[in-house]
């Protein structure tokens, strides 16, 4: 059996910001590797450095010092344009607020990342988008617009959009933050399914409960890793969903 390769590797990453005369040390030497097929939560309270780390992982920013490798590629010395290209090919983002274009269909939203990929024709884009929407259980809503869907359905569109480019890693930022309890567990069922299919997932959250459904948890405090543990007792989101009280009809 071949050893899995690190998709993400941080080596002593520091990120400092100058605010007036003060230096804010948002990340104070963060090192870890995330391997192919892992489902990792990154947790931390406000001020822990979680958002700064998310920007590093998403190639939205570069370290003050240290190294960041995404799928074996060094990010630190890249220009903004190079990082944008790498980000589009290697990372699938899922945001708390869905970030869907209004007045466009599910398929059109999911096609967006492929617009910048010259390897795809218009027909191939459409086929890939339909496949991704089927994968997240929205095969019946391909041509629905955002205002015709629930929050959970819109988040499924966002997850399909994240998957369409076959990224090295899916990076979810508080992806259940705007959803009710039942819909949140439906999303966790989907993330666990994607994990079982071999997708690498990083789920940034302030909710410690989500760590119980992931394979590993990294906890930040004051810009440093406080804890990095493997979860040997992964709970089933499907079982948790089934145990919830049935929704009452109005």
Describe the role of every protein-language-model region:
Residues 6-220:
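ABC family nucleotide-binding domain
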Residues 224-249:
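Conserved beta-strand-loop-alpha-helix hinge in the C-terminal portion
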């Amino acid at each position: 059996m071949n050893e899995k390769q690190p998709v993400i590797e941080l080596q002593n990453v520091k990120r400092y910001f100058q605010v007036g005369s003060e230096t804010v040390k948002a990340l104070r030497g963060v090192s870890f590797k995330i391997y192919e097929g892992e489902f990792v939560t990154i947790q931390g309270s406000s001020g822990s450095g979680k958002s700064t780390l998310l920007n590093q992982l998403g190639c939205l920013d570069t370290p003050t010092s240290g190294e960041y490798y995404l799928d074996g590629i060094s990010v630190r010395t890249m220009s903004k344009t190079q990082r944008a290209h790498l980000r589009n090919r290697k990372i699938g983002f899922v945001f708390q607020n869905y970030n869907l274009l209004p007045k466009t269909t599910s398929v059109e939203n999911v096609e967006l990342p492929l617009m910048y990929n010259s390897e795809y024709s218009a027909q191939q884009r459409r086929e890939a988008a339909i496949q991704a929407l089927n994968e997240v259980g929205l095969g019946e809503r391909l041509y629905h617009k955002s205002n015709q869907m629930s929050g959970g359905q819109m988040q499924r569109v966002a997850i399909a959009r994240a998957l369409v480019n076959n990224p090295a890693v899916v990076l979810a930022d508080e992806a259940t933050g705007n959803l009710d309890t039942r819909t949140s567990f439906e999303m966790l069922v989907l993330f666990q399914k994607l994990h079982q299919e071999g997708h690498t997932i990083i789920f940034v959250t302030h909710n410690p409960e989500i760590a119980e459904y992931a394979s590993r948890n990294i906890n930040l405090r004051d810009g440093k890793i406080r804890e990095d543990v493997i979860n040997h007792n992964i709970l089933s989101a499907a079982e948790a969903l089934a145990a919830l009280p049935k929704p009452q009809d109005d």
